[in-house]
């Protein structure tokens, strides 16, 4: 699920944008607990609002994009923490929200993750052509009538959805890492954008499985364990694999 979206984050250099949306998730958690709303739905709505607010400020404010991203990222995180601190009547597992807690996931969460994940993948498949065209060249996408602005809007909505449904597994502070690292790893092996998205999905799924297995075995936080697994995959991808294969074939004794 995170793989294809992560590819667009890497291609568009939107890592800090992903951080901003993921940090705003904690504000969504605080509002959900305060108003007794569904956490996943509230986080999704708050993430979309923050994304729209960012677009509005970029058009009207005097600050640069980096400054706006930093302002919104840390402001929403700080406000969320302050609101949670005042809610003394609610028992909040702050570490679970920040770094993920596999034990906090119930059957309803699993259903939401599956349905939400399939919906995100289906929506991404529908806007893939226009979104990729807008990534390569915005003007050409407009000239060809691919409606890149609409694709960009839905991309932000899909980002918010991924953050909302994966927050309990990875945690709000590490969601962006799960989006970026598998995509960065897949980039070294893929020969086409579609192949990169598929490989990134496979690497992301493997990282989640290995990370959760390690978390259960060694009693480590789920989110950091998943990110460490993804990081190990990226480090392995940096090794001169082709050179090693050639070396092994060269050292193999000749037959006959």
Give a label for each model feature.
Residues 37-49, 114-118, 164-178, 224:
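Structural signature of hydrophobic alpha-helical transmembrane segments
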Residues 122-155:
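Membrane-helix/interface signature in polytopic inner-membrane proteins
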Residues 40-45, 70-71, 110-115, 150-157, ...:
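Hydrophobic alpha-helical transmembrane segments
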Residues 24-34, 72-84, 104, 148-160, ...:
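Small-residue-rich segments of transmembrane alpha-helices in multi-pass membrane proteins
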Residues 220-256:
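Cytosolic-side transmembrane-helix boundaries in multi-pass membrane proteins
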Residues 7-90, 186-198, 215-218, 241-243:
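Short loop segments and helix-boundary regions at transmembrane helix junctions
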Residues 61, 69-129, 157:
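Transmembrane helix-bundle core of multi-pass membrane transporters
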